[in-house]
Amino acid sequence: MVVKAVCVINGDAKGTVFFEQESSETPVKVSGEVCGLAKGLHGFHVHEFGDNTNGCMSSGPHFNPYGKEHGAPVDENRHLGDLGNIEATGDCPTKVSITDSRITLFGADSIIGRTVVVHADADDLGKGGHELSKSTGNAGARIGCGVIGIAKV
């Protein structure tokens, strides 16, 4: 059973991101476009809560149900919500194209109802040596976010 979801990002960064998963055993395909980003890499994460009542700040930390350290999407030791970076050319829109085998749209660990956050700076993937590297990737301010909702299949 295919599950689809969508996230409308608002803030200084704006855009729409789509999620699709064919079954609980297959990767999630993430695609979309974001505008309002400076040229360079920008951290792109799923945060724990679908609460945007205080803007992006109320979305909580990265979605991390297994108590792991922050890491790269390819790392075994990573938050489930660690989707790495998107790269902006400085022109609108920035394309989002990610395939991830760790996030899911099914079951207790589903990202549906949680928040996508776009950050001002590059995610150092937990390898930057900064005091925030192992928790946030030192990705800077939260410049855009939106709640992931179920979409029509």
UniProtKB/Swiss-Prot annotation:
UniProt KW Nucleus keyword: no
Organism: Drosophila orena (Fruit fly)
Enzyme Commission numbers on file: 1.15.1.1
Subunit structure: Homodimer.
Catalytic activity of the protein: 2 superoxide + 2 H(+) = H2O2 + O2
Gene: Sod1
Lineage: Eukaryota, Metazoa, Ecdysozoa, Arthropoda, Hexapoda
Name of protein: Superoxide dismutase [Cu-Zn]
Positions annotated to bind Zn(2+): 62, 70, 79, 82
GO cellular component: cytoplasm
UniProt family annotation: Belongs to the Cu-Zn superoxide dismutase family.
Cofactor (UniProt): Cu cation; Zn(2+)
